[in-house]
Amino acid sequence: MIEDSGKRGNTMAERRQLFAEMRAQDLDRIRLSTYRTACKLRFVQKKCNLHLVDIWNVIEALRENALNNLDPNIELNVARLEAVLSTIFYQLNKRMPTTHQIHVEQSISLLLNFLLAAFDPEGHGKISVFAVKMALATLCGGKIMDKLRYIFSMISDSSGVMVYGRYDQFLREVLKLPTAVFEGPSFGYTEQSARSCFSQQKKVTLNGFLDTLMSDPPPQCLVWLPLLHRLANVENVFHPVECSYCHSESMMGFRYRCQQCHNYQLCQDCFWRGHAGGSHSNQHQMKEYTSWKSPAKKLTNALSKSLSCASSREPLHPMFPDQPEKPLNLAHIVPPRPVTSMNDTLFSHSVPSSGSPFITRSSPPKDSEVEQNKMLARAAPAFLKGRGIQYSLNVADRLADEHVLIGLYVNMLRNDPPCMLESSNRLDEEHRLIARYAARLAAESSSSQPTQQRSAPDISFTIDANKQQRQLIAELENKNREILQEIQRLRVEHEQASQPTPEKAQQNPTLLAELRLLRQRKDELEQRMSALQESRRELMVQLEGLMKLLKEEELKQGTQGASSPRSSPSHTISRPIPMPIRSASACPTPTHTPQDSLTGVGGDVQEAFAQSSRRNLRSDLLVAADSITNTMSSLVKELNSEVASETESTVDSEFSRPQFEDLAPSPTSEKAFLAQIHSRKPGYIHGGAASTTHGDMVPEDGDPYTQPEDGNYENESVRQLENELQLEEYLKQKLQDEAYQVSLQG
């Protein structure tokens, strides 16, 4: 009891959910009951996904659940009804593409609750088979003509004439649908509903039934049924016209044009809800349009009508024979399939139980007939192979093709004769049936021979086309498979290339060791280079200091020569000292030291080394030493040349050589060198007698000369020059030693 109450509560909640969503659409504001009812049923149809199912899918589901063999007045319980709905929606999902799959369980639940609310308001849990068929046929999608043909097959007799009692039952059941969406006062069932549609004194055939229900206007109680289908057909129709009330630039669905107001057009929402503006009134007559025609098309139609060359209007439906073809009684050969058979679906497509797709009346099956039914079902695929599923659906399912039955039976006889010839009576019946078919075909051969001659090539062409299509599909599938494999291979290669493998992570340890050693060696070389650059910068600073001293000495000598009474302008050392130049033998070599490494060094040294930023350290040191040596040598040569032009004594030729070894006296001959310089001064030659004689001094060349006694003559300039010469010699030796050590370390 608790479970039943819980299920009942869930059912009521789902019903309320569907109706609450319908009320949220604000459909009750539509002022016309016909449009209001059609819109509500259209909402239920789309919410339950029944607009994706046509009448043929419904018939197939009913046959799979054996409802075609049941009496229409038998009632189904909820479980059986749910099984029918499950068959419909699961088969629908198989036909739909994967991107448009529906929610099967939700659709089943919504439709089941709506049917229970419409046809079982008391909650008994049972619905008649006839009500289920009428509801599904009305709410499903597809053409209205096919649906009405199926409905007529359910309410007509074997002679093809409508039974008024069944039509009244049809109205009673189908009008429960508007009542379920709260439109019972407008379209509820009354006893006069059936009489208002057809006159009971007249026989109603299929053509009359279709003419009445598809006419314009249809019967008042069913006026919403054609509108429901027209609403579905124009749902996506576009009208490039502006609405005169809401001023929307385009319209979708129906379009309404006022017959009194000039160029006054309304969209379906404004017309349904009674919106009006300006001089327009809701009482004006409106014309409904389901499509858009350009002005040129309208002009063409008007000219065609005026010239009476317009084509006659096509009928609403094709004309069907008044007397339906009587189906053959094949109960003893092809009985109705049992419910428990596993081949029911295939057999229902290939061998129908009657000549009409809608009338399925037959006798209960027997055991022997059930076995024979299974054999026919197994033989059907072999016979219908290559003809396609459309052939089996359209021909076998709807028209009960006699040729298909004969072919199936002959195929069974050829494959398994003992099983089919169990009794002589059955054999006689089979021969009589075949003879009957042969006589009928012979009688129709004269009239149908051209058609058969044309149909044979058509069938062969269809078979060839199907074969080509299958081959093309197979080729495309193979190509698709190859493309997928290639994509997978490329993806694997990309992943392998992007992600390091364990082999790459664990390389050769020898290579790793060598790599570490190279990095250490690189660090050591960088440190040594930094040390060498620092040493070079210090040497350049020292060199700059020496050059400053030389310039200061030059200035001092020039000042003293101008102020001294014993000095003449020709004897003063006023010539500028030449700047250091690069040795021609020094070749530039690459170096990693930038020009900024001489930071703190004066401009003279930077100028001397500005062009040799890529020279190695050894060459730079040697060039610097050579430049200083050349400068001092030039100074000494100038001094010697000036003194030699004015002296009266003979000077040894070797003393005046420009070699550096003569210009740099040793410590033992320093006094002789200074005395010789003093003796060449003008003051020494023309001066008075010497007060003190130190004695003769022998220079390195062996020529004696006398040291002047005037000790004051050794002025500050001579002493400074002597000190500079000694310092220059010492610096040169030091630079050469450091360069040699650097070359040994490199």
Curated annotation (Swiss-Prot):
Protein name listed in UniProt: Dystrobrevin alpha
**GO CC terms, sorted:** cytoplasm; dystrobrevin complex; protein-containing complex; sarcolemma; synapse
Q: Where is this region: Interaction with MAGEE1?
A: 1-288
Gene3D superfamilies xref list:
3.30.60.90, EF-hand
**Phosphoserine carried by residues:** S666
Q: How is it modified after translation?
A: Phosphorylation of isoform 2 on tyrosine kinase substrate domain present in the C-terminus.
Q: Where is the composition biased (Low complexity)?
A: 563-576
